[in-house]
Design a protein with these regions (language model features):
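Hydrophobic transmembrane alpha-helices of multi-pass solute/ion transporters
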Residues: 1-72, 81-85, 89-91, 230-290, ...
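Membrane-interfacial loop-to-helix junctions in multi-pass transporters
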Residues: 2-5, 55-60, 87-103, 132-140, ...
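Short helix-coil transition sites and intra-membrane helix breaks within transmembrane domains
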Residues: 22-25, 58-59, 70-80, 109-121, ...
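Alpha-helical transmembrane segments
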Residues: 57-63, 174-190, 244-253, 361-370
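Hydrophobic alpha-helical transmembrane segments of multi-pass integral membrane proteins
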Residues: 62-65, 91-127, 289-292, 315-355, ...
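Re-entrant/interfacial helical elements at transmembrane boundaries that shape
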Residues: 82-84, 116-129, 157-168, 338-351, ...
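Alpha-helical transmembrane segments of multi-pass membrane proteins
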Residues: 94-108, 133-153, 174-178, 183, ...
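Membrane-core helix-loop-helix motifs of multi-pass transport proteins
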Residues: 128-222, 382-416
C-alpha cells in the first residue's frame, strides 16, 4: 500500500473514535473525506463528489417524497391507527408477545421506513402492552428494536434507491431480489430475541401498570389503511400494470393525497408537514449520503480502496465476509446502519464484478448487514429511544439483540452472494 493509504487507515480510526464519542456523523464523514483528499493532493475530488451527490435526482425524489408522506401520516394519526388495530388481537399472549411485537413492528416499518419514526409510534403502544404482561423493560424494548428492519423492504429506503441506481435496475426489482434475505433476517431477529429473552427469564417480571397519556387519540380503521397505500400501489402496478410506470415518488404523492382525503385535516398545516418531511429527509438522509460520498472520494484518492479491491479480487471469500461483517461492525460502532453501508457501497460495490459478484448482490449484502449492526448497537438512536420508552439501559437492550444479529449476518454472508 502507498503512504497515503496507511494515512487513510489512521484517519478512519480517528473517525471511528469521534463517532463513538457521539460527534455529528455527517461532520465526521465530510471532514475525514476532505482531509484525505487534501493529503492525497486531490482537493477537488471531495468537492466534486459533494456537488454531484447534492443533485442526485433519483435518490432525492424517492427519499424526500417518502419522508414527506411519513410526516403527514404521523400528523393525521394514520400511523397510530395502524398500530392500534394490529396490536389489539395480541394483548393476552404473555411471552409470545415478544416475537409477535417484533413481527408487527417489522411490517409496520415497511410502511413507515424510518426506524426512529416507527420506533416512536410502535414503541409507545407495544412497549406498555408488554410491560403490563410482565415482560421485563429491556426485553420489551428489544422486541420492538428487532422488528425495525422491515424498512429494508420499503421503496422509500435510501439504500434501495442508491443500490438500484448503481445496479441499473428498478427499486422494486432490487427489493424483489433481496426480499427473501430481508425476511430471513427479520425471522432470525424475532425468533432469536424470543429465545434469548426466554433464556434470561424476561417473561417473569412484575406486571407494570403503565398509563398512556390521554391525548384525545381516537383510532380509525380507515386511517389505518392509509400508510399501506403507497406499498399496495407499487406492488399492484409493478405486477399487473407495469405500463403505468408507478415510481416511488408517484406512489408517495398518491398516498399523501389519500391521507388528506381520509383524514381531512387543516390543509395548510398538512402541506407544511409534507414539505417539512421532505426538507428534514434531505438534511438527515441525503446529508449522510452526500457526506459518505465525500469520504468515498477521499478513500479512492488515497489509494486505500484500490489496495482493498486487489485483496478482494485475490479471494472472493474476503469480499463475502468483508462485505457483511465490515458494515455490520461499523454500524455497531457508529450507531448508524447508513454511514458504514453507504461508504462501502460508494467505494467497493461498483467493482463487484472484479471479484465475481453482482452489484445488487454485494450492495444489498452491505446494507442488510449494516441494518443488523445498527440493531445490535447500544448507541443507535432507535436503541436509545426505545430504551427510554421502556425505562431500560440501552446496553441491556442490545444484550438481547446482538446474538441474533450476529447469526443473521453470518447467514447473509453464506447464502446471499
Amino acid at each position: 500500500m502507498t503512504v497515503t493509504a496507511y494515512i487513510a487507515l489512521a484517519v478512519l480510526a480517528i473517525m471511528i473514535y469521534l463517532i463513538i464519542k457521539q460527534y455529528e456523523t455527517r461532520l465526521v464523514l465530510l471532514g475525514g473525506g476532505l482531509i484525505l483528499c487534501l493529503i492525497s493532493l486531490q482537493p477537488m475530488q471531495g468537492l466534486h463528489s459533494f456537488a454531484t451527490n447534492m443533485v442526485n435526482g433519483s435518490l432525492i425524489t424517492a427519499i424526500c417524497s417518502a419522508q414527506g408522506f411519513a410526516y403527514t401520516a404521523s400528523y393525521t394519526n394514520c400511523d397510530r391507527s395502524l398500530v392500534y388495530y394490529l396490536s389489539r388481537p395480541i394483548r393476552n399472549l404473555g411471552l409470545f408477545l415478544i416475537p409477535l411485537c417484533a413481527i408487527i413492528t417489522f411490517f409496520i416499518n415497511i410502511a413507515i421506513p424510518s426506524a426512529v419514526g416507527v420506533g416512536a409510534v410502535v414503541g409507545s403502544t407495544l412497549i406498555p402492552l408488554m410491560l403490563r404482561a410482565g415482560i421485563k423493560p429491556a426485553a420489551a424494548a428489544a422486541a420492538v428494536l428487532s422488528g425495525t428492519m422491515g424498512s429494508l423492504l420499503s421503496p422509500g429506503l435510501s439504500h434501495n434507491a442508491y443500490v438500484s441506481e448503481m445496479a441499473g435496475m428498478g427499486i422494486m426489482d432490487l427489493i424483489s431480489y433481496h426480499s427473501v434475505y430481508s425476511f430471513m433476517i427479520g425471522g432470525v431477529a424475532a425468533v432469536g430475541v424470543f429465545l434469548v429473552c426466554m433464556f434470561l427469564g424476561d417473561h417473569k417480571g412484575e406486571k407494570v401498570d403503565v398509563n398512556n397519556t390521554d391525548d384525545g387519540f381516537v383510532p380509525s380503521p380507515i386511517r389505518a389503511l392509509v400508510p399501506l397505500v403507497p406499498i399496495v400501489l407499487m406492488l399492484v402496478c409493478t405486477v399487473w400494470f407495469p405500463e403505468l410506470k408507478m415510481g416511488v415518488t408517484e406512489a408517495m404523492l398518491l398516498g399523501t393525497i389519500a391521507c388528506l382525503i381520509v383524514a381531512h385535516p387543516d390543509a395548510q398545516i398538512f402541506s407544511k408537514k409534507f414539505f417539512q418531511g421532505m426538507g428534514d429527509s434531505y438534511g438527515e438522509i441525503m446529508g449522510i449520503i452526500i457526506s459518505a460520498g465525500v469520504l468515498a472520494a477521499g478513500l479512492m484518492a488515497s489509494g486505500l480502496i484500490d489496495a482493498l479491491i486487489k485483496v478482494m479480487v485475490a479471494s472472493s471469500d474476503v469480499a463475502r465476509w468483508g462485505g457483511s461483517f465490515g458494515p455490520f461492525l461499523l454500524s455497531i460502532i457508529m450507531g448508524s446502519g447508513d454511514a458504514g453501508a453507504m461508504a462501502f457501497n460508494g467505494t467497493v460495490t461498483p467493482h463487484a464484478s472484479e471479484f465475481g459478484m453482482s452489484i445488487e448482490g454485494l450492495g444489498s449484502l452491505a446494507f442488510l448487514a449494516g441494518a443488523c449492526g445498527r440493531t445490535a448497537s447500544p448507541i443507535a438512536g432507535i436503541t436509545i429511544l426505545l430504551a427510554g420508552l421502556a425505562h431500560a439501559n440501552p446496553f441491556d437492550v442490545v444484550k438481547r439483540t446482538i446474538a441474533p444479529m450476529f447469526v443473521a449476518t453470518i447467514l447473509l454472508a453464506i447464502f446471499m452472494v
